[in-house]
Swiss-Prot record:
This is Glucose-1-phosphate adenylyltransferase. Alpha-D-glucose 1-phosphate binds at residues 121, 186, 201-202, 219. The lineage of its organism: Bacteria, Bacillati, Actinomycetota, Actinomycetes, Mycobacteriales. Homotetramer. It catalyses: alpha-D-glucose 1-phosphate + ATP + H(+) = ADP-alpha-D-glucose + diphosphate. Involved in the biosynthesis of ADP-glucose, a building block required for the elongation reactions to produce glycogen. Catalyzes the reaction between ATP and alpha-D-glucose 1-phosphate (G1P) to produce pyrophosphate and ADP-Glc. Its EC number is 2.7.7.27. GO terms for molecular function: ATP binding; glucose-1-phosphate adenylyltransferase activity.
Amino acid sequence: MFLCLIVGKPARGAEILDRLGFVRSKQNVLAIVLAGGEGKRLFPLTEDRAKPAVPFGGTYRLIDFVLSNLVNAGYLKICVLTQYKSHSLDRHISQAWQFSGPTSQYIASVPAQQRLGKRWYMGSADAILQSLNLVYDERPDYVLVFGADHVYRMDPEQMVADHIASGKAVTVAGIRVPRSEASAFGCIQADENNNITEFLEKPADPPGTPDDPSMTFASMGNYVFSTDALIQALKEDENNPDSEHDMGGDIIPYFVSMGQANVYDFNKNVVPGSTDRDRAYWRDVGTVDAFYEAHMDLISVHPVFNLYNQQWPIRSTERGDLPPAKFVQGGIAQASMVAQGSIVSGSTVRNSVVSTDVVVEEGATVEGSVIMPGARIGKGAVVRHCILDKNVVVSDGQVIGVDRERDEQRFQISPGGVVVVGKNFVV
């Protein structure tokens, strides 16, 4: 039986799936995506939505990257656990990520159910504990637990194969990051056989790697578990009064202490169409500055992350019914990405990412900015070094991103100087 993923035009989706060999069976694996995070460091972009629902790259949302990786690899039983302000995320999953074909294959948004009492999730491990009915229903041999808010390409099947070969209870995906940034991650120390000997969750003084003290081997927040071992660990963690019920802080160290944790080096992962330049690209866009810089990479002449690799496509149907972008009355865009449905009329866009359904009116200038869907930039307005959230209106003649002192009175400014205008704001 053939499976078709509806992503805009069904025929195109079917063509891609056929090319990727989607007749492969993955019946023994269940994927759980943790998508309940608040994303406080991305405020105000997360003021009205969960972090995985934040728009990215003109036509995507952050969750589209992990879902694309799982679907491209043929893992078609996916549960997305949501909690914090999840309405837009739930709606996106229901509209953009629906299968036509066997009902045994699905991407399901699963809000917090309070199955174990009148309490919300107390941590990432507690989220899975409270959702074990999903595991019991499917009875998989392996459970993938992936984060929902990173920008990257990965073939999870290669990690699963590595996990099976290791014979361990859990495999953690690891990547090298600068030691100066590693305090934001779980940090891994492993022996020559990839056995994790120590796992430190967000340490103040991260350890360097043996061959390069300036780098740290960090957890990507992606795990493969043998199912029985995961269930046992969650049950024991539930009854541990000292636990914070966190995957990285409690569950992974539990397996490390038992000698049952394996590390998978993300640098070994190869996806179709990748190059040496973009291989092992992974970005945590959890701060405004990181989010902004990831967008600036996209519009560079030779971006490190190539959105245009159709051998491993990043999928989304964010307003797929919109017409192409239009440039009229001498409107131009230079070194920019302009998404469908947008109109640049007698205005100039430079070094920017302009999302769907944006209007830039006569005489306006947009430079070095990220403009999210539905924004309106009025006549003669100037928007520079900014992030404008959805449906922001910049009135005629308004200037943002030029006078920092004035901007500080109205908007949030990141440590890197990026001005952020929140959703639905009228300037």
